Amino acid sequence: FSTRDLYYYARELFRHQRYDDCLKYLNKFIKRKDKYIEDYIDACILQSKVYCIKKEYQIALKCLFDTFTYDIPRVNTLIEIANIYFNSYDFDKAIYYYKLSLNSLKYYKNKGFIYKDYLGYYQSLSLCVCYFYLKKYKKAFYYNELAHKLKNDNPFYLPNKNAINKYVNWKND
């Protein structure tokens, strides 16, 4: 396999839920020197996803942090880190990485592929939920409104707003 073939083969193995084989080929790819940085970063993210499926979250985090040795942290990498903490109910750490991903958007130009929702909407919606769980309802409200501004067809906006309003007395707070 060429270096690039290793990467694409590993992605196919992932799509077919052959996770152990996927990791084997991702590791071969990552050890190669002649790879494009964005492919390396994407391979580390894919490795992390496999380890999350296997419920090996510390290894998943290490895969994501390894990307920092190649270049500045990517928005999608920071979101993946935040998601691991979010799914572990470690909302303070999730908040840190979601906010860091928002702040890193200014460095985004020409730094790989990014999902449209990762340009602020996803992070804002996730921050809303984090703050809601931490009972910081005004911050949850703020980020829900921001998510709505960024994507006004957001299906979560009204349910979130109604849930938050049940806990906030806007006149006395």
Language model feature labels by segment:
Residues 19-20, 57, 91, 137, ...:
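TPR-repeat structural position
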Residues 2, 40, 74, 113-120, ...:
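Residues that mark the junctions of alpha-helical repeat units in TPR/alpha-solenoid scaffolds
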